[in-house]
């Protein structure tokens, strides 16, 4: 098809602002699916995506639309994940487009996520079409939202399209706006081939299937292609596009979006953001913006039943086939046995992987407290990266420790400011910006350590704001901080899986809170058990679990005190001997308690 009639666009929206429903309506109106095949959220094919109401993987669907001017246009809708964990995938999907629909809920207004993705879209010079959705709601205030889009996002919203995706109102106007406002793709079909990979997944019959947008040149069946990041060469075995069912074709050219498979074995080979070129006539430079995705959050995953270790490894291998951002390596813990140290993009990613393991592979898991990657310079000047408390070096060898810092923006209502500011303060945040964005809403920009966010920040932010605050963050760099490793000793033995890395100023309180929580969770033994929190050799907190004891003097009626004393001394001697050889079983809840330590102690 002539490039003049191709439009590539994506939909930007905050979670729950109606992005997937709008995509459904666009498919329905353009006749991509018959009534019989329509179901809610056609593009969210994973069960988890539907249940949580989020989009995890990107999709690309071709719609054929005959506009009011009588011409037939090819619209490529590239559906992007909306969550902050997947922001790199979003930026690559946006790079494949020339325009974006900015969908805002008519009752809720602009949220932090919408803002972050809009800035990404502006960064890629996309044409942004504001769409105000859910105008059928009784609480809808389209005029107020128009002003808000102009003040907060800074784009002209006078011509914003009003629609209700649920009732199918205004869909025609959106399609017309795409045709008239989004520019056709640039790039020449005669230049050397350059195609951008913006998603890939694994198919057990065809290997890796790559979703791509052809920027320059053309791609044909049987052509030899090369991936520019790692230099690997493959032969194109299949080409096609989703409409939304996969439809095969023999050639794709500049401006078009489609998929290819070429007997690629792992998703790790076809990295998101990489450039595909041809072997015969290669492009001189790759497309800009490619970076290796680095995990930001780390946690240990262990099977509850130790014999399921092999099953867990197979399950993780299968997940990695589809998720190149997820990585893992085996680790061994004295307390939990064999398991894996896994790296994730963020907390949502961690939850999704955990849930998929439990749901699709039926494995019961113990997850250790999530942590982040620290940079440590030792006394001899070497730089090491540590993401596991057990690998934390001896304090005497450490010169400096740097922790990852994020820039977070929070949008909330003024009524909840007090609680949110207190929470940000408690999490060692420094305020960078504070602005009113109209209609009683405030936007806060803070610099926070990533370490403080990974435990329970999001949940507490939601409770402090009764669910009204929205959060977006991105990594901004590293900063030197006095971090220490807090060890937990149970009956004098350190339990590696309970160790955490904390800021020196909070180590005492954290240690105290953790020990008092463990005391409630570890059952009484036949002997006295000491629980201690230690930093290096210094004990900062201690609790004692008293022993269960039998009343040995119950059978003595009256009589001499020395008889009773003899029995009590005998019992004491036995308990002492037991304490020397006894082992304490730590229940699974105890490991989960580490996660809850930073919550205020009043909810105990």
Swiss-Prot record:
Superkingdom per UniProt: Bacteria
EC number: 3.6.5.n1
Keyword Protease recorded: no
Record key words, sorted: Cell inner membrane, Cell membrane, GTP-binding, Hydrolase, Membrane, Nucleotide-binding, Protein biosynthesis
Residue stretches making up the tr-type G domain: 4-186
Signal peptide: none
Localization per record: Cell inner membrane
Membrane topology of the entry: Peripheral membrane protein
GO cellular component terms attached to this protein's record: plasma membrane
Primary enzyme class: hydrolase
GO molecular function, one term: GTPase activity
Catalytic activity line of the entry: GTP + H2O = GDP + phosphate + H(+)
GO BP, one annotated term: positive regulation of translation
CDD domains: EF4_II, EF4_III, LepA, lepA_C
Residue positions binding GTP: 16-21, 133-136
Keyword hit for GTP-binding: yes
Chain's role: Required for accurate and efficient protein synthesis under certain stress conditions. May act as a fidelity factor of the translation reaction, by catalyzing a one-codon backward translocation of tRNAs on improperly translocated ribosomes. Back-translocation proceeds from a post-translocation (POST) complex to a pre-translocation (PRE) complex, thus giving elongation factor G a second chance to translocate the tRNAs correctly. Binds to ribosomes in a GTP-dependent manner.
Family, similarity comment: Belongs to the TRAFAC class translation factor GTPase superfamily. Classic translation factor GTPase family. LepA subfamily.
HAMAP family: LepA
PANTHER family: TRANSLATION FACTOR GUF1 HOMOLOG, CHLOROPLASTIC, TRANSLATION FACTOR GUF1-RELATED
Protein name from the UniProt record: Elongation factor 4
Species, as recorded: Solibacter usitatus (strain Ellin6076)
The encoding gene: lepA
């Amino acid at each position: 098809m002539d490039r003049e009639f191709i439009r590539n666009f994506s939909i930007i929206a905050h979670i729950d602002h109606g992005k997937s429903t709008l995509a459904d309506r666009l498919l329905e109106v353009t006749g991509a699916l018959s009534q019989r095949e329509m179901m809610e959220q056609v593009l969210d094919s994973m069960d988890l995506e539907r249940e949580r109401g989020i989009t995890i993987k990107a999709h690309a669907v071709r719609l054929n639309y005959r506009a009011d001017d009588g011409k037939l246009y090819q619209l490529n809708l590239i559906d992007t994940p909306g969550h902050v964990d997947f922001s790199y995938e979003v930026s690559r999907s946006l790079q494949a487009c020339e325009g974006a629909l900015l969908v805002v809920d008519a009752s809720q207004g602009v949220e932090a996520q919408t803002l972050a993705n809009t800035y990404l879209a502006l960064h890629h010079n996309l044409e942004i079409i504001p769409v105000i959705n859910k105008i059928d709601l009784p609480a809808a205030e389209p005029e107020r939202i128009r002003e808000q889009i102009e003040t907060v996002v800074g784009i002209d919203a006078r011509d914003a399209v009003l629609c209700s995706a649920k009732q199918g109102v205004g869909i025609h106007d959106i399609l017309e706006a795409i045709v008239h406002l989004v520019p056709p793709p640039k790039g020449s079909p005669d230049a050397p081939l350059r195609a951008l990979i913006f998603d890939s997944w694994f198919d057990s019959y065809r290997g890796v299937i790559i979703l791509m947008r052809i920027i320059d040149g053309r791609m044909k069946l049987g052509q030899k292609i090369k991936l520019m990041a790692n230099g690997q060469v493959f032969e194109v075995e299949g080409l096609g596009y989703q409409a939304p069912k996969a439809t095969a074709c023999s050639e794709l050219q500049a401006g078009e979006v489609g998929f290819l498979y070429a007997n690629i074995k792992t998703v790790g080979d076809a990295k998101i953001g990489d450039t595909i070129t041809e072997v015969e006539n290669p492009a001189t430079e790759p497309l800009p913006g490619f970076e290796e995705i680095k995990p930001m959050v780390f946690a240990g995953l262990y099977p509850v039943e130790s014999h399921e270790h092999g099953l867990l490894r197979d399950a993780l291998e299968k997940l990695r086939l589809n998720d190149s951002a997820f990585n893992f390596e085996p680790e061994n813990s004295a307390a939990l046995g064999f398991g894996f140290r896994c790296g994730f993009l963020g907390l949502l990613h961690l939850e999704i992987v955990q849930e998929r393991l439990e749901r699709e592979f039926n494995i019961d898991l113990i997850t250790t407290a999530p942590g982040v990657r620290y940079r440590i310079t030792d006394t001899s000047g070497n730089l090491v990266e540590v993401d596991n408390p057990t690998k934390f070096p001896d304090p005497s060898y450490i010169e400096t420790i740097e922790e990852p810092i994020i820039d977070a923006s929070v949008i909330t209502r003024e009524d909840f400011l007090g609680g949110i500011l207190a929470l940000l303060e408690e999490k060692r945040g420094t305020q960078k910006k504070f602005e009113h964005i109209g209609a009683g809403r405030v936007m806060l920009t803070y610099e926070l350590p990533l370490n403080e966010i990974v435990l329970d920040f999001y949940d507490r932010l939601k409770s402090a704001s009764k669910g009204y605050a929205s959060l977006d963050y991105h990594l901004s760099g590293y900063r030197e901080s006095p971090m220490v490793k807090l060890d937990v000793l149970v009956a004098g033995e350190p339990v590696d899986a309970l160790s955490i890395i904390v800021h020196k100023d909070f180590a005492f309180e954290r240690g105290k809170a953790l020990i008092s929580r463990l005391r409630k969770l570890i059952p009484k033994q036949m002997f006295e058990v000491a629980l201690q929190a230690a930093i290096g050799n210094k004990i900062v907190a201690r609790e004692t679990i008293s022993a269960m004891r039998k009343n040995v003097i119950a059978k003595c009626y009256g009589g001499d005190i020395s008889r009773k004393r003899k029995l009590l001394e005998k019992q004491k001697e036995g308990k002492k001997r037991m304490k020397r050889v006894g082992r304490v079983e730590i229940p699974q809840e105890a490991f989960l308690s580490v996660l809850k330590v930073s919550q205020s102690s009043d909810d105990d």
